[in-house]
Structure formats: structure tokens, C-alpha cells
């Protein structure tokens, strides 16, 4: 189809020869019919995906109607709507193709985004060996990843204390309204076993007996209660055990336990008797924590007025009291084969005492410069501390090193405990939640030498495997590792090829 068969080339003055009007109209009609025939044949050849190329081809054909192969131009040619009709036909063909694909998907039963009609995601079509798709591998890894710690427990009431059962996978949660919730925990789910109503006021501390059959609780109502865990029946009630609100409990063995109140009074009790064995008041402020070693000869107590007080259990009298500190002594733990006592303070410091010499500390570590209110020994040389900043940090004892962040809360941490196997750490915060952290990886930590170089700034902010946060440096470390692998691979290939011929 060429227009130059009917038109003469223009002269230098761009004048067209006189042509019969009927001939021009006939030629234009033939051109329009040819274009329509071509568009109909192209509908079967092109799909919606090729619409762009098709329109471009048709536009070129339309331009041929006005411009001849030898460059001639007909200004008298009439405009037609053939182009519009072609576009409409192409769009209609594309819509029909899309409709057919939609009907086919419906017949296969596939939902949006790879889901079945019920809306449940189906990832069976993903190919884990498809190394070219990083997203596919990440999705499969997330699906197959198993939990290493139980899910979070959330309560409506403020959680004042938590305690693990000495033998079973049970954790007790004491609340501000005086109830104790018993949960059976597991990596997949946590199950509420029972709720025991024990006190009329806030239950400040909860402990299990050594055999795990009974719960001991103390409260702001000045009472101590011993409750059977299975039957929920009250076994023993120490009514008005103290003149002031009781703040802390500590179980020494199967027979003895100690209590401390807000006024600094410490009492020792025997489960077989009604009254306390003895009581001493050596400080004027709240007892924050109590503990003893395996020999149970000395009972140690820290207080909010900055004293570390030691009581001789056998002699039932004061053993020694430390020099006063200008900060609250809030927690403590025993390390290095029962040879070291470490106490945490409200200023974030850690004081170390040689066992038996509690008058003054032998070493001091500045710590994290944030109030430390809780401490739990993880191993003989590693402690976990927590406080008002909402972070649980691990530190190495003697020499002191910040190992990193074990876990995080959005609000200050209220209580901290570790289970009987030493693999699971639990913490509660002011947000009424309990979170679990798997700390089994600490078994592989080696001893730290005194002269070993370290970066204190990075260690304080480093996230350990149990943390829900990742380190920014890990992303670049992976990139560096991949680059090193590529470099090593290239070096091996060069080595195998023999010496270079370049001189």
C-alpha cells in the first residue's frame, strides 16, 4: 500500500498537480479499509502485554496515510477516527485476556497473594533452593524458625514479683491486688493453671518452698501466708508477722525462711513453729534483699539506707555491718565459688566483697550509670542486672565486663528470676507483662582475662542472642563475610591456574 502510486511528487514550489477529487476520496477509503484489516489481524497476534508495541506500530501505519514513502505530504487528507477504533479494539482484547486469566485463577482455587479461598497462606510453592530470590529464603526461614523461649504473659493488674517453680515448668506471678497467678509455660504457649487469692492488699513477694509443694507470700497487710499449691488451701498463717509492711522473703532451706519489712526489721522463722525464732533491727529503712550461702551460717541483707548487714544465724545476733554508702544497696549475688559477694546500687555501681569480710568493699565497678534494682546470677562468673532503664544486661564478674543486652522492656523492670535449669530468664515490668529470655548461650562464654582489650562503649550497647533487637553492625558484617568469600574464591581459582604470566 503506497500513496505514491496515485499522487505525483510535489514540485520545488510545493505545489500539487490538479487531481480529481473523486480519485482522492477513493484512495483515502482504500487506505482506511487496509488499516482496519491490519488491526483485525493483529488482535490475534498481540496480547495485552504487547499493547504498547502494537499501538506504536499502528501509529506508524497511520502516519503513512499522510506521508508517502518519498516524503510527500497531503494537507487535504481528511482526519478519520480509525486510530480511536484501533485503540478501542486493542483495549477490548486486553480486557478479554485479563478476564480469562482471572477465571482460570478462580478455577484453580488460588486466593490473593498465594492464599487459599479460606484466606490461609500457602507457602508450599516457595522454592527454598531458589538462591536468586532473597525474599523467598527469608520467608521460609521465618516460617520454619522455632521459638527458643515462651511467649509473653500479659495481665491486667500490676505484677509485683515472679518466681519459678524449683522442679516443674511453672511460674508464679504476684499482683498488686493480692492474688497469685500460676502459669505453666512452654515455647508454644502459656497456660493459666489457677489463680489463688491470698492477701487483701498488695502481695509484695512470692517464693516456693524447696520441695515446690507450697507457696510463701508476704504482703503490705503485714501477714505471711503458706499455701498448698495443688489444693489452694491455707496451710499456715502468720498474722501480723511484722509491725510494718513486709517487703522481702527468703527461703533458706526446707525448715527456715526470713522476712524483712519497710522499717528495717529482719525476722527468722521456722515452718514448724508459730512465732519467729529471732528478730533484729539494725537499719532504719526498707530491706531490699536477703540471701545466704550453702552453709546457711550467715544471713545477709541490703537496705535502702545504704547498709550491708550480716546476721549470725546460729548465734542469733549481728555479725558485721558495712560502712554506710551514699546510695541505696538494692540487690546482690554470690559468685566465684562462693568467694565473692557483689551488690548493686541505685547509682548503677557494683561493689565486690570478699566472703566473710563485709565491712567494706574490695573492688568497685562503675557499672551502667543507671539505677540497678535487680540481680540474678547466671553462672559462677556472669550476672544479669536490670533496673529503671528497662534493659536486662549481662556482666562478667572479676574482671568486670559488660557483655551486652539480654532483653528489653518498654518500662522499668520490677522483678527478675531464673528457672531451675538455668536456661530461662523471666522478667516483669511496669507494663504488666512477663517476658522470657533463653540464656543457654552463656554456657559457651569463656573466662575473660584482666588485661584483655575491650570496647566498653560497644559492649554496653551490644545485643546478645536472646535480645529482640539486632545489632546494626551485624548487617555490615554479613556483607563483609560475603565479600571475603568471593575474594577467597577468586584467590583459590588464581592459585589453581598457576603463576601469573604478567611481568
Curated annotation (Swiss-Prot):
SUPFAM superfamilies: WD40 repeat-like (SSF50978). Keywords: Repeat, WD repeat. It comes from the Eukaryota. Residues 1-131, 476-503 are annotated as: Disordered. Residues 61-74, 107-122 have a biased composition (Low complexity). WD repeats lie at residues 154-193, 198-237, 241-279, 282-321, 324-363, 408-447. Residues 12-23, 31-48, 76-87 have a biased composition (Acidic residues). The keyword Metal-binding does not apply. PROSITE patterns: WD_REPEATS_1, WD_REPEATS_2, WD_REPEATS_REGION. It holds the Pfam family WDR55. Belongs to the WD repeat WDR55 family. This is WD repeat-containing protein 55 homolog. It comes from Drosophila grimshawi. The lineage of its organism: Eukaryota, Metazoa, Ecdysozoa, Arthropoda, Hexapoda.
Amino acid at each position: 500500500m503506497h500513496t505514491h502510486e496515485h499522487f505525483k511528487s510535489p514540485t520545488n514550489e510545493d505545489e500539487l498537480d490538479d487531481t480529481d477529487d473523486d480519485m482522492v476520496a477513493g484512495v483515502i477509503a482504500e487506505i482506511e479499509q487496509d488499516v482496519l484489516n491490519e488491526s483485525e489481524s493483529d488482535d490475534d497476534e498481540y496480547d495485552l502485554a504487547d499493547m504498547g508495541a502494537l499501538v506504536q506500530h499502528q501509529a506508524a501505519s497511520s502516519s503513512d496515510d499522510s506521508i508517502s514513502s518519498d516524503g510527500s505530504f497531503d494537507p487535504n487528507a481528511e482526519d478519520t477516527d480509525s486510530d480511536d477504533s484501533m485503540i478501542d479494539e486493542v483495549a477490548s482484547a486486553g480486557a478479554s485476556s485479563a478476564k480469562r486469566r482471572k477465571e482460570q485463577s478462580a478455577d484453580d482455587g488460588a486466593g490473593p497473594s498465594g492464599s487459599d479461598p479460606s484466606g490461609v497462606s500457602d507457602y508450599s510453592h516457595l522454592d527454598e533452593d531458589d538462591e536468586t530470590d532473597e525474599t523467598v529464603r527469608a520467608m521460609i526461614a521465618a516460617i520454619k524458625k522455632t521459638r527458643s523461649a515462651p511467649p509473653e504473659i500479659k495481665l491486667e493488674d500490676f505484677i509485683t514479683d515472679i518466681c519459678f517453680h524449683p522442679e516443674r515448668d511453672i511460674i508464679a506471678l504476684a499482683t498488686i491486688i493480692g492474688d497469685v497467678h500460676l502459669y505453666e509455660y512452654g515455647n508454644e504457649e502459656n497456660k493459666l493453671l489457677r489463680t489463688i487469692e491470698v492477701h487483701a492488699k498488695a502481695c509484695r513477694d512470692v517464693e516456693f518452698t524447696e520441695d515446690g509443694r507450697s507457696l510463701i507470700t508476704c504482703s503490705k497487710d503485714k501477714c505471711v501466708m503458706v499455701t498448698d499449691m495443688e489444693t489452694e488451701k491455707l496451710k499456715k498463717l502468720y498474722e501480723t508477722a511484722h509491725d510494718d509492711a513486709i517487703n522481702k522473703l527468703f527461703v533458706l532451706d526446707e525448715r527456715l525462711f526470713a522476712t524483712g519489712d519497710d522499717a528495717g526489721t529482719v525476722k527468722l522463722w521456722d515452718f514448724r513453729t508459730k512465732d519467729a525464732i529471732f528478730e533484729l533491727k539494725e537499719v532504719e529503712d526498707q530491706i531490699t534483699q536477703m540471701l545466704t550461702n550453702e552453709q546457711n551460717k550467715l544471713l545477709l541483707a541490703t537496705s535502702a539506707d545504704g547498709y550491708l548487714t550480716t546476721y549470725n544465724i546460729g548465734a542469733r545476733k549481728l555479725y558485721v555491718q558495712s560502712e554506710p554508702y551514699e546510695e541505696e544497696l538494692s540487690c546482690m549475688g554470690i559468685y566465684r565459688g562462693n568467694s565473692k559477694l557483689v551488690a548493686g546500687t541505685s547509682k548503677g555501681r557494683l561493689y565486690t566483697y570478699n566472703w566473710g569480710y563485709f565491712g567494706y568493699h574490695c573492688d568497685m565497678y562503675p557499672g551502667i550509670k543507671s539505677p540497678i534494682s535487680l540481680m540474678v546470677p547466671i553462672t559462677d562468673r556472669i550476672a544479669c542486672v536490670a533496673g529503671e532503664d528497662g534493659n536486662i544486661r549481662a556482666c562478667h564478674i572479676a574482671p568486670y565486663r559488660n557483655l551486652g543486652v539480654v532483653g528489653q522492656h518498654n518500662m522499668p523492670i520490677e522483678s527478675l528470676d531464673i528457672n531451675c535449669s538455668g536456661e530461662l530468664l523471666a522478667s516483669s515490668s511496669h507494663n504488666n507483662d512477663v517476658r522470657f529470655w533463653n540464656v543457654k548461650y552463656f554456657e559457651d562464654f569463656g573466662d575473660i582475662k584482666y588485661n584483655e582489650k575491650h570496647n566498653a562503649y560497644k559492649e554496653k550497647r551490644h545485643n546478645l542472642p536472646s535480645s529482640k533487637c539486632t545489632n546494626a553492625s551485624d548487617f555490615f558484617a554479613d556483607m563483609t563475610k560475603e565479600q571475603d568469600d568471593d575474594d577467597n574464591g577468586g584467590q583459590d581459582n588464581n592459585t589453581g591456574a598457576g603463576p601469573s604470566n604478567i611481568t
